[in-house]
C-alpha cells in the first residue's frame, strides 16, 4: 500500500505523517492517548481492494501468478453492499442520528443548485454513522458468505469465495433492490457529501458541491 501514499489526500487520516487513504477515525474505538493513534482508525480501502479483486482472477488463470494473503481481502463497503443491509431491514439508523442527518440535508438543500430530491439523512464521509455503517457492512459480508455456502450445501473447494459472493450475490442483489425500491435513477437512501476518493460518484458537469449515496 505504500505505493499509493502519494495519491491519497493529505487532508485524510495520517499515521506518522503518512496519508493512509480510505481509512477513517471512529469514536467507538479506543482514543489516543492512551491508545495508539492507529487503534482509532478503521481501514477500508474499497477501491484498492476492488482493483485487486478485478486483476487477480485473470492474472492467476492466464499467468499462473499466486497472490499471497489474498484471503485477507475484505468485503467491499460501498452503497450496493451496505445499502442492501438497510433495504432488507437488517440495519437502521438510530433516531438521534436520523434526525441529525435530516437536519443536515435540509440545511444543505438551501445551497443554490442542489438537486430537488426527497429528504434523506445527510452525512459526511468521516461521520461516525458512515464509518460504522461501512465497518458493519464488512463484518456482515463475512457472515453472509458463510450463510450462503451453508444454505447451498457447498463444502470445501466447492464453496463460494467472498469475491464470488460479492459479485454474484450481495452486489447484484443490492443493485437490484436499489433499482426496485427507488422510483428514479438518482433516488437515494442516505446522502453523502462528495468525496471522490471514497466512492464512485455520478456527477453532472455543472455540479460544484453535490451529495451522493455511499
Enumerate the predicted regions with their spans.
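Long, intrinsically disordered, low-complexity Ser/Thr/Pro-rich regulatory/activation regions
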Residues: 97-117, 121-122, 126
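Extended, well-ordered protein cores
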Residues: 1-64, 68-97, 120-214
Amino acid at each position: 500500500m505504500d505505493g499509493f501514499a502519494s495519491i491519497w489526500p493529505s487532508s485524510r487520516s495520517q499515521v506518522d505523517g503518512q496519508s493512509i487513504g480510505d481509512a477513517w477515525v471512529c469514536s467507538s474505538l479506543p482514543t489516543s492517548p492512551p491508545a495508539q493513534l492507529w487503534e482509532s482508525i478503521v481501514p477500508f480501502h474499497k477501491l484498492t481492494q476492488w482493483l485487486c479483486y478485478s486483476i487477480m482472477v485473470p492474472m492467476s488463470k492466464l499467468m499462473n501468478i499466486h497472490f499471497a494473503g489474498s484471503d485477507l481481502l475484505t468485503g467491499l463497503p460501498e452503497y450496493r453492499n451496505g445499502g442492501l443491509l438497510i433495504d432488507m431491514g437488517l440495519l437502521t439508523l438510530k433516531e438521534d442520528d436520523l434526525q441529525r442527518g435530516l437536519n443536515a440535508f435540509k440545511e444543505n438543500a438551501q445551497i443554490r443548485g442542489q438537486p430537488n430530491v426527497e429528504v434523506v439523512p445527510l452525512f459526511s464521509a468521516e461521520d461516525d454513522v458512515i464509518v460504522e455503517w461501512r465497518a458493519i457492512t464488512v463484518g456482515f459480508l463475512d457472515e453472509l458468505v458463510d450463510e450462503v455456502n451453508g444454505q447451498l450445501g457447498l463444502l470445501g473447494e466447492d464453496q463460494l469465495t467472498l469475491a464470488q459472493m460479492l459479485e454474484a450475490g450481495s452486489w447484484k442483489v443490492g443493485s437490484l433492490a436499489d433499482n426496485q425500491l427507488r422510483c428514479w435513477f438518482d433516488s437515494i437512501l442516505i446522502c453523502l457529501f462528495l468525496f471522490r476518493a471514497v466512492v464512485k460518484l455520478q456527477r453532472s458537469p455543472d455540479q460544484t458541491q453535490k451529495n451522493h449515496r455511499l
